[in-house]
Amino acid sequence: MKLIERRQYLDKLINVLGTPDIKVITGVRRSGKSKLLEAFRAYIESENPDCNIIQINFNLPDYDDLLTYRALYDYVNAHYVAGKENFVFIDEVQMCKDFEKAVNGLHASEKYDIYITGSNAFLLSSDLATLFTGRTFEIKVYPFSFREYMAVSYTHLRAHETGRNL
């Protein structure tokens, strides 16, 4: 499946790159938060190949041992690399119990540029300013707009028509 670049969201992340805010990407399930984080990671790596990116995806069983805030906090700190720009990407952060304690602790250390995604009702409805002690920048990701849907559908339709005409 072809990845549809959603430039409006990527540009928002690029604009806050390196700011001290905790960047929070929210949206309903399957709206493209994880794909946005992947695209942003690719952008960062192309601009700063020497950086250190600590990525945790709680959708994968590889990270089941990090489901407590203390384990998450310790894991990130164990992967810190002094002398490099350190980024933390945590996908579906709400799956970690008391995740805000880990995120607040990492943010307070001032060693990381932090990006998290979440999709549960608690994270979507909560006041992020009270959940996180530091400043936050929220990007709300929505499912495809009608224009995006039509662009994908038209591309698929054209490929199908071309195949039939051969």
Residue ranges and their predicted role:
Residues K33:
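Conserved lysine of the Walker
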Residues I25:
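Hydrophobic anchor at the beta1->P-loop junction of P-loop NTPases
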Residues D113-S119:
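Structural recognition of the conserved hydrophobic beta-strand(s) that form the central parallel beta-sheet
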Residues L123-T136:
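Short regulatory helix/loop adjacent to the ATP-binding pocket of P-loop NTPases
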Residues L36:
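Hydrophobic positions on the alpha1 helix immediately C-terminal to the Walker A/P-loop
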Residues E5-L17:
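Pre-Walker A adenine-sensing motif
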Residues I56-G83:
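Short glycine-rich substrate-engagement loop in P-loop NTPases that contacts/grips substrate
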Residues H156-L166:
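Single conserved hydrophobic/aromatic residue that forms the stacking wall/gate
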